[in-house]
């Protein structure tokens, strides 16, 4: 179960921030042990006894970020509700999980993304996936969807 994450961390080398969008399933201590940088982790619908927060807001550079697992915003149906919530929070970026399927859109100043899942991918082909976000020298965000 941890093999894919271990591989990704090894390939990535140095990272400044790690974000997990829920369904940690009791692996909080493991993540604390292997992730040495700043981390933001939210509770998913399978994290029954977790004390992790349901959602978080923070800034990455000039971007205000809202993260949530997404099930409270019906992301399995569409992204309309989560977009509405992100806009009400003045977010520039909203990240969610829950569907275990990669998703990316940029519209009217809002980036909406789901990196997919390293452990339980559900998109066609079921390739484990994650996303890398980099901020360039001018402070602009760039995103890369990656597959194992």
Predicted regions and their residues:
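A short helix->loop->beta-strand "cap" motif at the edges of active sites that frequently abuts
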Residues: 36-38, 110
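Active-site neighborhood of phospho(di)ester-bond hydrolases with catalytic His/Asp-centered motifs
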Residues: 17-23, 40-45, 66-69, 93-98, ...
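N-terminal active-site segment of His-dependent metallophosphoesterases
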Residues: 1-36, 47-48, 53-54, 126-129, ...
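Helix-adjacent hinge/juxtasegments
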Residues: 38-85, 89
């Amino acid at each position: 179960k941890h093999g894919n994450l271990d591989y990704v961390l090894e390939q990535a080398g140095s990272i400044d921030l790690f974000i997990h969008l829920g369904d940690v399933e009791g692996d909080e201590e493991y993540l604390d042990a292997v992730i040495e940088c700043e981390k933001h982790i939210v509770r998913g619908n399978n994290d029954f006894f977790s004390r992790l927060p349901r959602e978080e807001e923070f800034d990455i550079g000039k971007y205000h970020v809202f993260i949530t697992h997404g099930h409270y915003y019906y992301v399995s149906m569409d992204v309309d509700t989560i977009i509405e919530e992100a806009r009400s929070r003045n977010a520039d970026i909203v990240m969610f999980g829950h569907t275990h399927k990669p998703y990316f859109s940029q519209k009217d100043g809002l980036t909406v993304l789901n990196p997919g899942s390293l452990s339980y991918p559900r998109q066609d082909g079921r390739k484990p996936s994650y996303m890398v976000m980099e901020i360039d020298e001018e402070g602009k965000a760039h995103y890369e969807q990656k597959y194992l």
